[in-house]
Amino acid sequence: MNKLIRFGVSLGRDLLGRFDTLIAERGYASRSEAFRDLIRGSLVEEEWRKGGEVAGAITLVYDHHKKDLVNRLTDLQHDVHDLIISTQHIHLDHDHCLEIIAVRGRAAEVRQLADSLRSVKGVLQGTVNMASTGKKLG
């Protein structure tokens, strides 16, 4: 781990009060830890924006009774198997499934996969959760 460096941040009283409330609600041990998380979050967003190597999760909710839906989703995943680290399939009820697809690759390729999966008829919801490979977060 890198050596920690102290520096000052100037904030308005109201903004600091709201930040302190957020810190308490989320259970951070200190302002510093919360601030580090905010910085890391911004760095992850920037990695995704610049199109570098990223990690993340694509989540899908779908009705598995829709004709050919499961086969179509599987085919799309096999077409880019090098992006997919792992998948988890969860039965929400008799009709609906949740699929979580862990991915790693170039941001544009991950977005394209997510868009392809979300656009399949029968997919009720699809989201992409951005994460980092951790290589640039220090």
Set out the residue ranges of the language-model regions.
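Short, charge-rich, low-complexity interaction segments located
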Residues: 35, 44-51
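Short amphipathic alpha-helices in soluble, non-transmembrane regions
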Residues: 71-76, 112-120
